[in-house]
């Protein structure tokens, strides 16, 4: 549900950013000032104080044992790869390609790009019903295919508005995969260990968000859009392979 709500907001953001970009390229950056009131409000939130003394040695030992498990490492790699597929070929390369290849204006690019968020919202909103019919493994593999297929032909799409289809599918991949991965990461340990585990997962997210735009920008400069999206396709294949081994098949209950 959280992914669906955030995706609903991000449907509007590219459109607003594109319209502001038509006015001035500096204007979209002023939107970040809206975060300042939120920062002030967060200082007013009262947090509960921990009960008793914290056994840090036991905490780090238990958390370290969880983080060294093969399944935990697989989840962190999967998180990194998913955000690499999002922030590299989609968030970074597509707006540049749309301007260079289709000579599209900022508002048109923003409107087309909003289909990523629409796909993510619809997939995340329908995830509870889908999970009732199919296992997490099946859904994450479907999400992996949705990451991979659009990147296979996005560079060869003849028109800007036709890009809405692969972008929508790419957004659906996010809506299917990220809630499932985040839920499984949170369940790796006990509630006492959850903060450290989620911190490592979030670090993997931020590293991917930082490295992927730079990496795919370099690839697009050297091998143009075909090279960038071929690299994104390879990332999608890696997502499928890691998900195949990390998520265990759902086993039917034994009959007595």
Pin down the residues of each PLM region.
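Intracellular juxtamembrane helix-capping segments at the cytosolic ends
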Residues: 176-189
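A late C-terminal transmembrane helix in Major Facilitator Superfamily
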Residues: 191-223
């Amino acid at each position: 549900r959280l992914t669906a709500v955030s995706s609903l907001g991000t449907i509007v953001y590219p459109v607003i950013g594109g319209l502001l970009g038509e006015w001035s390229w500096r204007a979209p950056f002023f939107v970040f000032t809206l975060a300042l009131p939120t920062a002030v409000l967060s200082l007013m939130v009262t947090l509960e104080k921990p009960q008793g003394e914290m056994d840090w040695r036991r905490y780090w030992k238990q958390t370290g044992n969880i983080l060294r498990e093969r399944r935990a490492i697989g989840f962190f790699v999967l998180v990194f790869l998913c955000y690499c597929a999002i922030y590299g070929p989609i968030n970074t390369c597509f707006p540049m390609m749309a301007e260079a290849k289709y000579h599209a204006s900022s508002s048109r690019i923003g409107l087309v790009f909003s289909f990523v968020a629409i796909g993510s919202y619809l997939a995340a909103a329908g995830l509870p019903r889908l999970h009732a019919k199919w296992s997490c493994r099946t859904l994450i593999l479907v999400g992996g295919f949705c990451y991979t297929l659009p990147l296979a032909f996005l560079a060869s799409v003849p028109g800007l508005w036709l890009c809405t289809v692969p972008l929508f599918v790419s957004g659906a991949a996010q809506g299917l995969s990220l809630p499932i991965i985040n839920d499984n990461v949170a369940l790796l340990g006990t509630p006492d260990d959850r903060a450290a585990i989620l911190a490592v997962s979030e670090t993997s997210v931020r590293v991917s968000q930082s490295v992927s735009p730079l990496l795919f920008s370099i690839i697009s400069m050297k091998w143009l859009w075909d090279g960038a999206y071929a690299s994104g396709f390879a990332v999608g294949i890696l997502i499928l392979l890691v998900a195949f081994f990390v998520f265990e098949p759902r086993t039917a209950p034994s009959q007595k």
